[in-house]
From Swiss-Prot:
Coiled coil: none
Highest taxon above the source species: Bacteria
Single biological process term from Gene Ontology: arginine catabolic process to succinate
Function: Catalyzes the transfer of succinyl-CoA to arginine to produce N(2)-succinylarginine.
Pathway it works in: Amino-acid degradation; L-arginine degradation via AST pathway; L-glutamate and succinate from L-arginine: step 1/5
Keywords: Acyltransferase, Arginine metabolism, Transferase
Binding residues annotated for succinyl-CoA, in chain numbering: 125
Organism: Escherichia fergusonii (strain ATCC 35469 / DSM 13698 / CCUG 18766 / IAM 14443 / JCM 21226 / LMG 7866 / NBRC 102419 / NCTC 12128 / CDC 0568-73)
Taxonomic lineage from the root: Bacteria, Pseudomonadati, Pseudomonadota, Gammaproteobacteria, Enterobacterales
Similarity section: Belongs to the arginine N-succinyltransferase family.
Entry EC number(s): 2.3.1.109
SUPFAM superfamilies for this protein: Acyl-CoA N-acyltransferases (Nat)
Gene Ontology molecular function, alphabetical: arginine N-succinyltransferase activity
UniProt name for this protein: Arginine N-succinyltransferase
Active site: 229 (proton donor)
Length: 344
Protein backbone atom coordinates (compact mmCIF):
# COMPACT_ATOMS: atom_id res chain seq x y z
CA UNK A 1 0.00 0.00 0.00
CA UNK A 2 1.25 3.46 -0.89
CA UNK A 3 1.32 5.82 2.10
CA UNK A 4 2.23 9.48 2.55
CA UNK A 5 4.15 10.17 5.77
CA UNK A 6 6.44 12.87 7.24
CA UNK A 7 10.08 12.63 6.20
CA UNK A 8 12.54 10.98 8.62
CA UNK A 9 16.31 11.25 9.07
CA UNK A 10 16.78 7.75 7.66
CA UNK A 11 15.27 8.86 4.33
CA UNK A 12 18.33 10.83 3.23
CA UNK A 13 19.80 8.08 1.01
CA UNK A 14 16.41 7.53 -0.63
CA UNK A 15 16.11 11.26 -1.29
CA UNK A 16 19.59 11.26 -2.84
CA UNK A 17 18.43 8.54 -5.21
CA UNK A 18 15.35 10.55 -6.14
CA UNK A 19 17.44 13.69 -6.65
CA UNK A 20 19.69 11.82 -9.08
CA UNK A 21 16.67 11.12 -11.30
CA UNK A 22 15.25 14.65 -11.63
CA UNK A 23 17.33 15.63 -14.66
CA UNK A 24 17.99 19.10 -13.22
CA UNK A 25 15.69 22.07 -12.89
CA UNK A 26 14.14 20.97 -9.60
CA UNK A 27 15.96 23.58 -7.53
CA UNK A 28 14.74 22.38 -4.14
CA UNK A 29 15.90 18.77 -4.65
CA UNK A 30 19.64 18.99 -5.39
CA UNK A 31 21.74 15.83 -5.40
CA UNK A 32 23.67 17.10 -2.38
CA UNK A 33 23.55 15.01 0.78
CA UNK A 34 24.38 17.85 3.19
CA UNK A 35 21.62 20.03 1.75
CA UNK A 36 19.06 17.21 1.85
CA UNK A 37 20.01 16.32 5.43
CA UNK A 38 19.60 19.96 6.45
CA UNK A 39 16.21 20.04 4.73
CA UNK A 40 15.10 16.96 6.69
CA UNK A 41 16.32 18.52 9.96
CA UNK A 42 14.41 21.71 9.20
CA UNK A 43 11.24 19.70 8.57
CA UNK A 44 11.64 17.78 11.83
CA UNK A 45 12.20 21.03 13.75
CA UNK A 46 9.11 22.48 12.08
CA UNK A 47 7.00 19.60 13.38
CA UNK A 48 8.56 20.01 16.80
CA UNK A 49 7.64 23.71 16.88
CA UNK A 50 11.24 24.90 17.18
CA UNK A 51 11.38 27.31 14.21
CA UNK A 52 9.92 30.75 13.44
CA UNK A 53 7.36 30.89 10.65
CA UNK A 54 9.93 32.29 8.23
CA UNK A 55 11.95 29.05 8.43
CA UNK A 56 9.17 26.47 8.66
CA UNK A 57 8.81 23.83 5.97
CA UNK A 58 7.13 20.42 5.90
CA UNK A 59 8.49 17.51 3.84
CA UNK A 60 6.58 14.30 3.09
CA UNK A 61 7.52 11.09 1.30
CA UNK A 62 5.49 8.50 -0.57
CA UNK A 63 6.38 5.04 0.73
CA UNK A 64 5.44 1.51 -0.26
CA UNK A 65 4.41 0.20 3.16
CA UNK A 66 5.21 -3.40 2.21
CA UNK A 67 8.79 -2.87 1.02
CA UNK A 68 9.71 0.46 2.63
CA UNK A 69 10.67 1.87 -0.79
CA UNK A 70 10.48 5.67 -0.96
CA UNK A 71 8.91 6.47 -4.34
CA UNK A 72 8.41 10.23 -4.16
CA UNK A 73 8.72 13.48 -2.24
CA UNK A 74 6.57 16.58 -1.79
CA UNK A 75 6.83 19.60 0.49
CA UNK A 76 5.19 22.79 1.74
CA UNK A 77 7.00 25.99 2.69
CA UNK A 78 4.94 27.83 5.30
CA UNK A 79 5.84 31.43 4.34
CA UNK A 80 8.27 32.28 1.54
CA UNK A 81 10.47 35.34 1.29
CA UNK A 82 10.56 36.34 4.96
CA UNK A 83 14.28 35.56 5.31
CA UNK A 84 15.67 35.66 1.77
CA UNK A 85 13.80 37.76 -0.81
CA UNK A 86 11.43 35.73 -2.99
CA UNK A 87 11.81 36.80 -6.61
CA UNK A 88 9.55 36.39 -9.62
CA UNK A 89 9.16 38.24 -12.85
CA UNK A 90 5.69 39.69 -13.37
CA UNK A 91 4.81 39.64 -17.05
CA UNK A 92 3.23 43.05 -17.61
CA UNK A 93 2.90 45.68 -20.31
CA UNK A 94 4.55 49.02 -21.03
CA UNK A 95 2.92 51.29 -23.60
CA UNK A 96 4.92 53.61 -25.85
CA UNK A 97 2.74 55.95 -27.87
CA UNK A 98 2.93 59.15 -29.90
CA UNK A 99 -0.20 60.78 -31.28
CA UNK A 100 1.91 63.07 -33.41
CA UNK A 101 3.58 60.14 -35.16
CA UNK A 102 0.50 57.90 -34.94
CA UNK A 103 2.52 55.23 -33.13
CA UNK A 104 1.15 52.99 -30.39
CA UNK A 105 3.14 50.04 -29.08
CA UNK A 106 2.09 47.86 -26.13
CA UNK A 107 5.21 45.90 -25.22
CA UNK A 108 5.27 42.78 -23.02
CA UNK A 109 7.70 43.52 -20.20
CA UNK A 110 9.24 41.61 -17.29
CA UNK A 111 9.15 43.38 -13.92
CA UNK A 112 11.18 42.03 -11.00
CA UNK A 113 8.72 41.30 -8.19
CA UNK A 114 8.49 40.19 -4.56
CA UNK A 115 4.68 40.08 -4.68
CA UNK A 116 4.36 36.54 -3.27
CA UNK A 117 6.28 37.30 -0.08
CA UNK A 118 4.59 35.58 2.87
CA UNK A 119 2.62 33.08 0.76
CA UNK A 120 2.68 29.37 1.53
CA UNK A 121 4.32 27.35 -1.23
CA UNK A 122 3.83 23.87 -2.65
CA UNK A 123 7.27 22.66 -3.70
CA UNK A 124 9.70 19.78 -4.23
CA UNK A 125 7.20 17.50 -5.96
CA UNK A 126 8.97 14.55 -7.56
CA UNK A 127 7.80 11.01 -8.21
CA UNK A 128 10.23 8.30 -9.28
CA UNK A 129 9.48 7.55 -12.97
CA UNK A 130 9.16 3.84 -12.10
CA UNK A 131 6.22 4.66 -9.80
CA UNK A 132 4.23 6.91 -12.12
CA UNK A 133 1.14 4.71 -12.12
CA UNK A 134 -2.04 3.84 -10.20
CA UNK A 135 -2.77 7.35 -9.00
CA UNK A 136 0.55 7.78 -7.18
CA UNK A 137 1.17 11.21 -8.69
CA UNK A 138 -2.25 12.45 -7.60
CA UNK A 139 -1.76 11.04 -4.10
CA UNK A 140 1.68 12.63 -3.78
CA UNK A 141 0.60 16.08 -4.97
CA UNK A 142 -2.81 16.34 -3.30
CA UNK A 143 -1.86 14.81 0.06
CA UNK A 144 -0.51 18.25 0.97
CA UNK A 145 -3.99 19.72 0.74
CA UNK A 146 -5.21 17.22 3.35
CA UNK A 147 -2.46 18.40 5.70
CA UNK A 148 -3.28 22.04 5.04
CA UNK A 149 -6.99 21.41 5.61
CA UNK A 150 -6.34 19.61 8.90
CA UNK A 151 -3.89 22.23 10.19
CA UNK A 152 -5.20 25.34 8.43
CA UNK A 153 -3.89 27.75 11.09
CA UNK A 154 -0.30 26.79 10.21
CA UNK A 155 -0.56 28.30 6.72
CA UNK A 156 -1.20 31.64 5.06
CA UNK A 157 -4.17 32.72 2.97
CA UNK A 158 -2.47 32.37 -0.41
CA UNK A 159 -0.64 29.32 -1.69
CA UNK A 160 1.68 29.35 -4.70
CA UNK A 161 3.47 26.70 -6.76
CA UNK A 162 6.44 27.35 -9.05
CA UNK A 163 6.26 25.01 -12.02
CA UNK A 164 9.40 23.75 -13.71
CA UNK A 165 10.07 25.63 -16.94
CA UNK A 166 11.33 24.40 -20.30
CA UNK A 167 14.77 22.77 -20.00
CA UNK A 168 16.14 20.07 -22.30
CA UNK A 169 17.83 16.82 -21.28
CA UNK A 170 21.24 18.53 -21.39
CA UNK A 171 20.20 21.24 -18.92
CA UNK A 172 19.75 23.89 -21.62
CA UNK A 173 17.16 26.56 -20.75
CA UNK A 174 16.24 28.98 -23.58
CA UNK A 175 15.02 31.58 -21.09
CA UNK A 176 18.19 31.42 -19.02
CA UNK A 177 20.40 31.45 -22.09
CA UNK A 178 18.77 34.62 -23.41
CA UNK A 179 18.39 36.51 -20.12
CA UNK A 180 19.85 35.12 -16.90
CA UNK A 181 23.19 34.06 -18.31
CA UNK A 182 23.90 37.63 -19.46
CA UNK A 183 23.73 38.88 -15.86
CA UNK A 184 24.95 35.85 -13.89
CA UNK A 185 27.73 34.67 -16.25
CA UNK A 186 27.20 31.01 -15.40
CA UNK A 187 25.34 28.01 -16.82
CA UNK A 188 21.78 27.31 -15.77
CA UNK A 189 22.78 24.13 -13.93
CA UNK A 190 25.32 26.06 -11.82
CA UNK A 191 22.84 28.79 -10.86
CA UNK A 192 20.20 26.16 -10.15
CA UNK A 193 22.58 24.21 -7.89
CA UNK A 194 23.67 27.32 -5.96
CA UNK A 195 20.05 28.26 -5.37
CA UNK A 196 19.12 24.71 -4.33
CA UNK A 197 21.95 24.53 -1.81
CA UNK A 198 20.90 27.76 -0.12
CA UNK A 199 23.53 30.06 -1.65
CA UNK A 200 21.04 32.67 -2.82
CA UNK A 201 22.87 35.94 -2.09
CA UNK A 202 24.10 36.09 -5.68
CA UNK A 203 20.52 36.52 -6.94
CA UNK A 204 20.00 39.83 -5.16
CA UNK A 205 23.50 40.96 -6.11
CA UNK A 206 23.32 40.18 -9.82
CA UNK A 207 19.63 40.39 -10.77
CA UNK A 208 18.71 43.04 -13.35
CA UNK A 209 16.72 45.62 -11.39
CA UNK A 210 15.05 47.37 -14.33
CA UNK A 211 12.10 46.21 -16.47
CA UNK A 212 13.06 44.02 -19.43
CA UNK A 213 11.24 44.13 -22.77
CA UNK A 214 10.60 40.54 -23.81
CA UNK A 215 11.14 41.52 -27.47
CA UNK A 216 14.84 41.89 -26.61
CA UNK A 217 14.99 38.17 -25.79
CA UNK A 218 15.46 35.47 -28.41
CA UNK A 219 12.28 34.16 -30.01
CA UNK A 220 13.01 30.78 -28.41
CA UNK A 221 13.11 32.42 -24.96
CA UNK A 222 9.93 34.42 -25.61
CA UNK A 223 8.12 31.22 -26.61
CA UNK A 224 8.81 29.47 -23.28
CA UNK A 225 7.68 32.30 -20.97
CA UNK A 226 4.99 30.83 -18.72
CA UNK A 227 5.39 27.35 -20.26
CA UNK A 228 6.16 24.15 -18.33
CA UNK A 229 8.61 21.31 -18.89
CA UNK A 230 6.78 18.49 -20.74
CA UNK A 231 7.15 16.21 -17.69
CA UNK A 232 5.57 18.94 -15.53
CA UNK A 233 2.46 19.40 -17.69
CA UNK A 234 0.47 16.73 -15.75
CA UNK A 235 1.36 18.38 -12.41
CA UNK A 236 0.18 21.73 -13.75
CA UNK A 237 -3.11 20.20 -14.90
CA UNK A 238 -3.63 18.63 -11.46
CA UNK A 239 -3.23 22.00 -9.72
CA UNK A 240 -5.41 23.84 -12.22
CA UNK A 241 -8.24 21.37 -11.60
CA UNK A 242 -7.88 22.16 -7.89
CA UNK A 243 -8.39 25.87 -8.57
CA UNK A 244 -4.85 27.17 -9.18
CA UNK A 245 -4.31 29.75 -11.90
CA UNK A 246 -1.40 31.37 -13.74
CA UNK A 247 -1.48 35.11 -12.97
CA UNK A 248 1.47 36.23 -15.11
CA UNK A 249 4.26 35.50 -12.64
CA UNK A 250 7.22 33.44 -13.85
CA UNK A 251 10.43 31.96 -12.47
CA UNK A 252 13.48 34.20 -12.81
CA UNK A 253 15.69 31.30 -13.94
CA UNK A 254 13.74 29.17 -16.42
CA UNK A 255 10.63 31.28 -17.12
CA UNK A 256 8.25 28.59 -15.83
CA UNK A 257 4.83 29.72 -14.54
CA UNK A 258 3.95 30.36 -10.91
CA UNK A 259 0.43 29.14 -10.14
CA UNK A 260 -1.54 30.54 -7.21
CA UNK A 261 -4.82 30.11 -5.34
CA UNK A 262 -6.48 31.36 -2.17
CA UNK A 263 -5.99 28.44 0.20
CA UNK A 264 -9.66 28.22 1.18
CA UNK A 265 -10.66 27.99 -2.49
CA UNK A 266 -8.56 24.89 -3.21
CA UNK A 267 -11.09 22.17 -4.07
CA UNK A 268 -9.58 19.39 -1.94
CA UNK A 269 -9.32 21.70 1.07
CA UNK A 270 -12.77 23.20 0.62
CA UNK A 271 -14.57 19.89 0.05
CA UNK A 272 -12.73 17.65 2.51
CA UNK A 273 -14.66 16.65 5.64
CA UNK A 274 -14.31 14.52 8.74
CA UNK A 275 -15.98 11.11 8.98
CA UNK A 276 -15.83 8.28 11.50
CA UNK A 277 -13.98 5.09 10.60
CA UNK A 278 -14.89 1.51 11.39
CA UNK A 279 -13.09 -1.77 10.73
CA UNK A 280 -14.58 -4.26 8.32
CA UNK A 281 -14.84 -5.27 4.69
CA UNK A 282 -15.44 -2.22 2.49
CA UNK A 283 -18.57 -2.36 0.34
CA UNK A 284 -18.09 -3.65 -3.19
CA UNK A 285 -18.95 -1.42 -6.10
CA UNK A 286 -17.72 1.11 -8.63
CA UNK A 287 -16.52 3.79 -6.23
CA UNK A 288 -14.15 6.66 -7.07
CA UNK A 289 -10.68 6.94 -5.56
CA UNK A 290 -10.64 9.13 -2.45
CA UNK A 291 -7.92 10.64 -0.29
CA UNK A 292 -8.15 9.56 3.34
CA UNK A 293 -5.95 11.21 5.98
CA UNK A 294 -5.66 11.02 9.74
CA UNK A 295 -5.71 14.17 11.89
CA UNK A 296 -2.46 13.35 13.70
CA UNK A 297 -0.04 16.27 13.31
CA UNK A 298 3.14 14.41 14.26
CA UNK A 299 2.22 11.08 12.63
CA UNK A 300 0.29 12.33 9.62
CA UNK A 301 -0.68 9.70 7.03
CA UNK A 302 -2.61 9.73 3.75
CA UNK A 303 -3.72 6.78 1.61
CA UNK A 304 -5.93 6.23 -1.42
CA UNK A 305 -9.17 4.32 -0.87
CA UNK A 306 -12.02 3.52 -3.25
CA UNK A 307 -15.20 4.48 -1.45
CA UNK A 308 -18.34 6.58 -1.57
CA UNK A 309 -17.07 10.15 -1.01
CA UNK A 310 -20.44 11.08 0.55
CA UNK A 311 -20.34 8.37 3.22
CA UNK A 312 -20.77 9.34 6.87
CA UNK A 313 -19.05 6.20 8.16
CA UNK A 314 -15.97 4.93 6.38
CA UNK A 315 -15.33 1.18 6.50
CA UNK A 316 -11.62 0.35 6.25
CA UNK A 317 -9.69 -2.91 6.42
CA UNK A 318 -7.33 -3.59 9.32
CA UNK A 319 -4.39 -2.97 6.96
CA UNK A 320 -5.76 0.41 5.90
CA UNK A 321 -6.38 1.44 9.50
CA UNK A 322 -2.86 0.38 10.39
CA UNK A 323 -1.38 2.36 7.48
CA UNK A 324 -3.31 5.42 8.66
CA UNK A 325 -2.28 4.91 12.31
CA UNK A 326 -6.00 4.92 13.15
CA UNK A 327 -8.43 2.89 15.22
CA UNK A 328 -12.13 2.20 14.80
CA UNK A 329 -14.09 5.19 16.07
CA UNK A 330 -11.44 7.75 15.07
CA UNK A 331 -12.30 10.55 12.71
CA UNK A 332 -10.45 10.87 9.42
CA UNK A 333 -10.49 13.44 6.64
CA UNK A 334 -12.05 12.32 3.37
CA UNK A 335 -12.28 13.89 -0.08
CA UNK A 336 -12.71 12.65 -3.62
CA UNK A 337 -9.28 12.39 -5.30
CA UNK A 338 -10.35 14.18 -8.47
CA UNK A 339 -13.07 16.73 -9.08
CA UNK A 340 -16.25 15.27 -10.53
CA UNK A 341 -16.47 15.84 -14.25
CA UNK A 342 -19.32 18.21 -15.01
CA UNK A 343 -21.94 16.66 -17.26
CA UNK A 344 -23.96 18.70 -19.72
Amino acid sequence: MMVIRPVERTDVSALMQLASKTGGGLTSLPANEATLSARIERAIKTWQGELPKSEQGYVFVLEDSETGTVAGICAIEVAVGLNDPWYNYRVGTLVHASKELNVYNALPTLFLSNDHTGSSELCTLFLDPDWRKEGNGYLLSKSRFMFMAAFRDKFNDKVVAEMRGVIDEHGYSPFWQSLGKRFFSMDFSRADFLCGTGQKAFIAELMPKHPIYTHFLSQEAQDVIGQVHPQTAPARAVLEKEGFRYRNYIDIFDGGPTLECDIDRVRAIRKSRLVEVAEGQPAQGEFPACLVANENYHHFRVVLVRTDPATERLILTAAQLDALKCHAGDRVRLVRLCAEEKTA
